[in-house]
Amino acid sequence: MLTLTQGKKIVNALRSRLAFEYNGQLIKILSKNIMAVGSLRREEKMLNDVDLLIIVPEKKLLKYVLPNIRIKGLSFSVKVCGERKCVLFIEWEKKTYQLDLFTALAEEKPYAIFHFTGPVSYLIRIRAALKKKNYKLNQYGLFKNQTLVPLKITTERELIKELGFTYRVPKKRL
C-alpha cells in the first residue's frame, strides 16, 4: 500500500525516466504520453499500485514498448509483460511497489483513459446501459454489432458526452 502523495511522486519521477528499446536504440517516452489512471487518477487516499497509461504514437511500436521497457535510475523486475499490459515491481525509497503499465494508440486514448480509470462498478453501469442499445465499450473503442463506431472525439469528457451520460470527474465516480 502507498499513499496518494507517494503515488504522485512516483508518477512524477517516472515521467522523465521511461524509455523502451527499439532496433538497438533507447527511445524516451514523452511525458505528455504518460498519464496516471486507476485509483491514482481517482485520487483515492490509499493505493494498492500505480497505474500508468502510455500513448503509443504508431501501431508498429506497440509490440516493442512494454516488452522492452526501461526505467532510468530505478531498479525494477517484471512480473508479466505483453504488448498491452505490463506488471512491474519497482524499488522506490527502499520499498517495493507494483507498477501496472498499459498501452493505447492515440485514437484509443479517450476510451483507454475511461477504461483504466474506472472504477469497475462505474464501468459496469455504463456498459450495461450501452448494451441495451446494442453497443459495446472497451479500452479500444465503441462498437455496434462488432463494428467500430467512429467518433470524432479526443478526450474522455467528449466520449462520455457523446455516449449520452453526464461526465463525472474521476474522484466522484462510484
Curated annotation (Swiss-Prot):
<protein>
    <recommendedName>
        <fullName>Repair DNA polymerase X</fullName>
        <ecNumber>2.7.7.7</ecNumber>
    </recommendedName>
</protein>
<comment type="similarity">
    <text>Belongs to the DNA polymerase type-X family.</text>
</comment>
<keyword id="KW-0460">Magnesium</keyword>
<keyword id="KW-0946">Virion</keyword>
<dbReference type="GO" id="GO:0003887">
    <property type="term" value="F:DNA-directed DNA polymerase activity"/>
</dbReference>
<dbReference type="GO" id="GO:0046872">
    <property type="term" value="F:metal ion binding"/>
</dbReference>
<dbReference type="InterPro" id="IPR037160">
    <property type="entry name" value="DNA_Pol_thumb_sf"/>
</dbReference>
<feature type="site" description="Stabilizes dGTP in a syn conformation to overcome the Watson-Crick base pairing constraint">
    <location>
        <position position="115"/>
    </location>
</feature>
<keyword id="KW-0239">DNA-directed DNA polymerase</keyword>
<keyword id="KW-0234">DNA repair</keyword>
<feature type="binding site">
    <location>
        <position position="49"/>
    </location>
    <ligand>
        <name>Mg(2+)</name>
    </ligand>
</feature>
<dbReference type="GO" id="GO:0044423">
    <property type="term" value="C:virion component"/>
</dbReference>
<dbReference type="InterPro" id="IPR043519">
    <property type="entry name" value="NT_sf"/>
</dbReference>
<keyword id="KW-0238">DNA-binding</keyword>
<dbReference type="InterPro" id="IPR029398">
    <property type="entry name" value="PolB_thumb"/>
</dbReference>
<keyword id="KW-0227">DNA damage</keyword>
<dbReference type="GO" id="GO:0006303">
    <property type="term" value="P:double-strand break repair via nonhomologous end joining"/>
</dbReference>
<dbReference type="Pfam" id="PF14791">
    <property type="entry name" value="DNA_pol_B_thumb"/>
</dbReference>
<dbReference type="InterPro" id="IPR019843">
    <property type="entry name" value="DNA_pol-X_BS"/>
</dbReference>
<keyword id="KW-0548">Nucleotidyltransferase</keyword>
<keyword id="KW-0808">Transferase</keyword>
<keyword id="KW-0479">Metal-binding</keyword>
<comment type="function">
    <text>Error-prone polymerase lacking a proofreading 3'-5' exonuclease which catalyzes the gap-filling reaction during the DNA repair process. Specifically binds intermediates in the single-nucleotide base-excision repair process. Also catalyzes DNA polymerization with low nucleotide-insertion fidelity. Probably acts as a strategic DNA mutase, which gives rise to a rapid emergence of variants. Generates mismatched G-G pairs, in that case, the polymerase first binds the deoxynucleotide followed by mismatch formation.</text>
</comment>
<feature type="binding site">
    <location>
        <position position="100"/>
    </location>
    <ligand>
        <name>Mg(2+)</name>
    </ligand>
</feature>
<keyword id="KW-1015">Disulfide bond</keyword>
<feature type="region of interest" description="Involved in ssDNA binding">
    <location>
        <begin position="42"/>
        <end position="51"/>
    </location>
</feature>
<dbReference type="InterPro" id="IPR022312">
    <property type="entry name" value="DNA_pol_X"/>
</dbReference>
<dbReference type="GO" id="GO:0003677">
    <property type="term" value="F:DNA binding"/>
</dbReference>
<feature type="disulfide bond">
    <location>
        <begin position="81"/>
        <end position="86"/>
    </location>
</feature>
<feature type="binding site">
    <location>
        <position position="51"/>
    </location>
    <ligand>
        <name>Mg(2+)</name>
    </ligand>
</feature>
